[in-house]
């Protein structure tokens, strides 16, 4: 007779996500995950396969939520409004939690010397998906007209800038500073359209 799980998988994944986000991939242990989820380590291994598999499933949730929020923010009638809303989402993502958790993608990428190929691929996939969504949003005629750069290069520098913001957040823990930096960055991107944009 098959054993019935005594826990809700969705709840466990949300709790695991919070632990990984708060402590980081490397510092999180299976004991931490068992304590946070109130599920024994053996049951976690049986249900999810191990720390890396649990991280990847939790990261799926993080990715879906973040990309959905970013997409909604980018759906604006002008470049300035789209970028303002996007950076609000990105900064809120970094500064949420108590204490603030930072950006899970950037924390994971920089915290350890070697990441498994699976985790590297997942981080890359999120950044690529984010860049694609930004490019698509900036390609709309009404939005593109306000940019100094063509949409694809603009999206690349926006994604790179968000990684810098994530590092600044870890050092200073000042949301107002992050918003000011984002506002200044947006002002550099806006203006007469680049030739051929």
Regions found by a protein language model. Name each.
Residues 11, 15, 19-53, 57:
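Helix-turn-helix
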Residues 57, 71-101, 151-158:
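Hydrophobic alpha-helical connector segments
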Residues 60-66:
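Short, basic, alpha-helical segments at the C-terminal edge of helix-turn-helix-like DNA-binding modules
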Residues 77, 81, 121-125, 140-157, ...:
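All-alpha amphipathic helical-bundle segments outside canonical DNA-binding/catalytic cores
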Residues 83, 97-121:
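Amphipathic alpha-helical segments used for helix-helix packing
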Residues 93-96, 158-176, 188-196:
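Amphipathic C-terminal alpha-helical segment
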Residues 101, 148-168, 180-188:
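Hydrophobic alpha-helical segments that form the core
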Residues 115-117, 128-154, 190-197:
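Hydrophobic alpha-helical bundle segments that form small-molecule/ligand-binding pockets
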């Amino acid at each position: 007779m098959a054993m019935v799980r005594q826990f809700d998988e969705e709840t466990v994944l949300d709790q695991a996500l919070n632990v990984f986000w708060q402590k980081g991939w490397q510092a999180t242990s299976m004991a931490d995950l068992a304590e946070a989820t109130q599920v024994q380590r053996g049951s976690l291994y049986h249900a999810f396969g191990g720390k890396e598999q649990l991280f990847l499933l939790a990261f799926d949730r993080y990715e879906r939520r973040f990309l959905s929020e970013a997409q909604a923010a980018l759906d604006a009638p002008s470049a300035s409004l789209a970028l303002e809303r996007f950076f609000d989402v990105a900064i809120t993502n970094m500064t949420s939690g108590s204490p603030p958790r930072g950006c899970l993608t950037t924390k994971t990428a920089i915290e350890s010397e070697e990441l498994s190929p699976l985790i590297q691929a997942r981080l890359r996939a999120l950044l690529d998906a984010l860049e694609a969504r930004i490019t698509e949003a900036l390609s709309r005629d009404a939005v593109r007209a306000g940019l100094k750069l063509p949409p694809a290069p603009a999206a690349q520098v926006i994604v790179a800038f968000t990684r810098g913001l994530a590092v600044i957040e870890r050092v200073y823990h000042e949301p107002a500073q992050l918003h000011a930096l984002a506002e200044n960055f947006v002002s550099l991107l806006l203006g007469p359209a680049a030739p051929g944009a």
